[in-house]
């Protein structure tokens, strides 16, 4: 079986996330990363002048961050592995009268997007990758970006993941309270600043990695929850 067809390949992950976006998971109709508004971090980055040129929203989900930037006049492309998420994002764009492109793509390849982007935003995609896949992702972004492009990577931390898991477990019976033991189940999966730094070591310079908050939602209650995260800013060489 090839990696692409294996349990961690894009085909398997498409099925997993499509089911989530169809409402066929313990989260119900709303997964915890679909907060119904842009992430406050990216609102602040845009206001600070740190978004520019052609923008890629990598792992865009249903498009809230991409649509926020499109509403500000940016040329935005949102890419996601899930056709269901992309369809929902396109519907939102049409309903709001916003001009944004949404397509299905594998973030570890980004074939056909070479040299297209000046800014990347990522809400919670990088933190799903182990060390090897994170390096492949950074390499794909390098190919898709122009020299000097900035990648803003918002990635939940170990502490934030534990906070979110505990709150979800209180609200949803099917979700266990403790996080899985990553050391045994996925040895390369970490949620540290060093994990991000190492992943973007080739072809990128690290401008900053700072502690911040990522916003999630507790699906049954619609409670918004801000938990600890890392914000990495990387510049393409």
Q: Where are the regions that the model predicts?
A:
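Conserved acidic residues
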Residues: 118
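A conserved beta-strand element that flanks and buttresses the S-adenosyl-L-methionine
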Residues: 121
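Class I (Rossmann-like) S-adenosyl-L-methionine-dependent methyltransferase catalytic domain
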Residues: 2-56, 61-115, 129-144, 149-237
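Short catalytic micro-motifs in class I SAM-dependent methyltransferases
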Residues: 124-128
């Amino acid at each position: 079986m090839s990696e692409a067809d294996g349990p961690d390949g894009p085909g398997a992950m498409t099925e997993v996330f499509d089911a989530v976006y169809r409402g066929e998971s313990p989260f119900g109709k709303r997964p915890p990363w679909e907060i119904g508004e842009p992430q406050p971090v990216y609102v602040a980055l845009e206001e600070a002048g740190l978004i520019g040129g052609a923008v890629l929203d990598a792992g865009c989900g249903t498009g809230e961050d991409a649509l926020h930037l499109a509403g500000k006049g940016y040329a935005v492309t949102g890419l996601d592995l899930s056709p269901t998420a992309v369809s929902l994002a396109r519907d939102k764009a049409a309903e709001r009268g916003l001009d944004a492109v949404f397509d299905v793509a594998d973030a570890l390849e980004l074939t056909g997007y070479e040299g297209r982007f000046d800014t990347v935003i990522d809400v919670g995609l990088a933190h799903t990758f182990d060390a090897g896949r994170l390096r492949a992702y950074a390499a794909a972004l390098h190919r898709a970006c122009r020299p000097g492009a900035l990648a803003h990577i918002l990635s939940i931390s170990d502490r934030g993941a534990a906070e979110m898991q505990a709150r979800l477990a209180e609200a949803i019976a099917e979700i266990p309270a403790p996080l899985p033991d990553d050391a045994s189940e996925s040895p390369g999966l970490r949620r540290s600043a060093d994990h991000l730094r190492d992943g973007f070591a080739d072809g990128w310079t690290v401008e900053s990695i700072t502690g911040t908050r990522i916003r999630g939602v507790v699906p049954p209650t619609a409670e918004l929850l801000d938990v600890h995260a890392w914000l990495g800013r990387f510049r393409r060489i």
